[in-house]
Amino acid sequence: MAGVDFEQGPGGIKLAFLQDGSGDDLGRCGFFWLGGFMSDMLGTKAEALAALARETRRPGLRFDYSGHGQSEGLFTDGTISEWLEQSIHMFIEKTKSKRIIVGSSMGGWLALLLAKVLLRDDPRAARRIAGIVLIAPAADMTNDLMWDEFSPEVRQQLEARGVYQRPSEYGDPMPITLKLLEDGAKHLLLKTGLELPCPVRILQGSSDPDVPPSHALKVFEALSGPDITMTLIKGGDHRLSTRGQLMLIRETALQLAERADGITP
């Protein structure tokens, strides 16, 4: 693995990224990782996808959003709009070959938004999206999984202070800002739906407390296209990071990449 590099993203913020596997010059379909809320590019699933890129000599790219990992910026300044803009920038500027976009949790929402924007504004770049893998996709999370779930007391705190420290079983509390919630409302997908020409695979744990299966089903139902499937993993939690679950993620991404290369039908 090469060392961490930095790209000057939108607004001049330096975004940390890693290139894995081969270069784009081999012409093979590669991978593009989009991580979750408060996650970084060195997480278990990101590392598993990076290892797959190296093992199969395919290009892989992963990066940290602003306020995440090794990138510049404060987490509490971040919004869906900014992280989406950064994702688009990295896809266009740092990848050249076809890619399978693999998005986890919030990264699943960003993957769908990325495809939506490129299909509308840059069809040439959109054609390089050869498939999308959504892991516990948290589309519309600022509304459906945050604001709608908050008690009146939490909502009052947000409106008065601009931030709510949401307890997390994964570590320190998650700061949820009113700015994030208000901005997220601009990017809601589930009610309007989204048509995608590329294959889409949704992988969802049946015991996920953060993005419940019912929400993943809403995502599934909101998407239309020629090849969309959803796999429910018995007993799987939000992380989906056991050895078997990581193998499923890898196999799913590789199958789509091989199909894009014409290796499998």
Language model features by range: what are they?
Residues 37-50, 214:
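The serine-hydrolase catalytic nucleophile loop
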Residues 90-153:
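Primarily recognizes the serine-hydrolase "nucleophile elbow" in alpha/beta-hydrolase
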